[in-house]
Regions:
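Exposed beta-strand and adjacent loop surfaces of beta-rich binding modules
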Residues: 37, 57-59, 72, 108, ...
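Short acidic/polar N-terminal linker immediately downstream of export determinants
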Residues: 1-60, 65-67, 89-96, 195-205
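Structural motif
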Residues: 34, 43, 54, 78-79, ...
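Charged, low-complexity, helix/coiled-coil-prone segments
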Residues: 17-19, 43-57, 69-73, 124-135, ...
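Active-site alpha-helical segments that house and flank conserved acidic catalytic motifs
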Residues: 38-40, 111, 129, 148, ...
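Right-handed parallel beta-helix
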Residues: 26-33, 71-140, 156, 176, ...
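Short, surface-exposed interaction patches in beta-rich subdomains
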Residues: 139-150, 154-223
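A broad, low-specificity signal for short, low-complexity segments enriched in glycine/proline
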Residues: 19-23, 36, 43-48, 71-73, ...
Length: 223
């Protein structure tokens, strides 16, 4: 566990649901040293990754909602990888931990949440994102690889340079992939919605694109 200077604010407010969490807390801390990769896992909150200014410090904000027991997420840095992990509170207690991380653009990210949204902005490192019930959004990215999967939400991936491989998959929402000029090997399928591919396609292209949904629309369009 790395040491850090942290600020904590505790608030009480209205219950999010009739029997849901009714307390909130927030903690922000900086992470010393060089971070080249991020792994973040949370039981039910959102995850947001935004670029830090050149030379700036990596900073993490954790936002908690809970009822009886305050969450105790962990964080550590090993070999340049920052690992954030938040489990449920156990014994039927309800709680969520949401993350907002200021991160170098070139750091790779591996993000997983059981029920929240995932948002990544300005990344140039590889992206892997998975959520059970929320949306996944990638904006202004030049990542060479990006993979996004959600069971019930929408996927919207916008790249400003041609990736080597990009994929968006959802069981029940829409998939939209936005790409710059170029030709792409595209596999775009939907079982119950509309299909739109308006970028130049070439089965032999080195730029592989996969977009799949079982129940929504699928679109691969110019950015």
């Amino acid at each position: 566990m790395l040491s850090c200077a942290a600020s904590v604010v505790l608030m009480t407010g209205c219950s999010l649901t009739g029997f849901g969490p009714d307390k909130e807390a927030e903690r922000t801390y900086t992470v010393p040293g060089k971070v080249t990769a991020l792994s973040a896992t949370t039981h039910g909150g959102n995850i947001e990754v935004v670029p830090v200014d050149a030379g700036g410090q990596v900073k993490v904000t954790e936002k908690y909602v809970y009822n009886e027991r305050k969450p105790s997420p962990s964080h550590e840095v090993k070999d340049g990888r920052l690992t954030l992990e938040a489990e449920d509170c156990g014994m039927g207690r309800r709680c969520e931990v949401a993350y907002r991380v200021l991160l170098p653009r070139d750091a790779s990210v591996d993000l997983r949440t059981s029920g929240g949204d995932i948002t990544v902005r300005g990344a140039t490192g590889g992206i892997a994102a998975e959520t059970s019930g929320g949306d996944i959004t990638v904006k202004d990215s030049t990542a060479r690889t990006a993979k996004a999967r959600t069971s019930g939400g929408d996927v919207d991936l916008a790249l400003s340079s041609a990736p080597d491989e990009i994929s968006g998959r959802t069981s029940g929402g829409n998939v939209t992939i936005r790409l710059p000029k170029g030709s792409y090997a595209v596999e775009a399928t939907t079982s119950g919605g509309n299909r739109k591919v308006s970028v130049p396609t070439d089965e032999g292209s080195a730029h592989k694109v996969t977009a799949r949904t079982s129940g929504g629309d699928v679109s691969v369009v110019p950015s």
